Amino acid sequence: MTKDWDELDQKERKLSEQLEEMSHRRFRVEQILRDFEDYDRSLYFSENDLWEASLGSRYAYQLEERNQELQYHRRQMFHDFCDCIDSLKKEERRIEDDIEAIYYKKRKESLK
C-alpha cells in the first residue's frame, strides 16, 4: 500500500504544482488582456480625435485607412488573448480532473 500511496502522492504533488503554474499563467494573461483593453480604449478615442481634426484635409482618408488596419490587428490580438485564456482554462480543468482521479485512487487504496 505504501509504494502505491507514495506514487499517487508524488503524482498529486506534481499535478498540484502544474495547476498552480497554469493558474498563475492564466492570471497573468488576463492582466495583460485588461491592460491591452485599457490601451485600446484610449487609443480608439485618440484616433477618433485625430481623424476629426484632419477632416477636410488630404490626410483624412489615409488616417481612416490606417485606423481600420490598426483596429483589425487589435481585434486579432484580443481574440488571440482570449484563445490563450481558453486553452489555459482547459488545461487547468484537465489537471483538476487528473487530481480528482488520484484522490479517488488514494481513497480506494486507503480502504484496502
Descriptions of predicted regions:
Residues 1-112:
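Charge-rich amphipathic alpha-helical interaction elements
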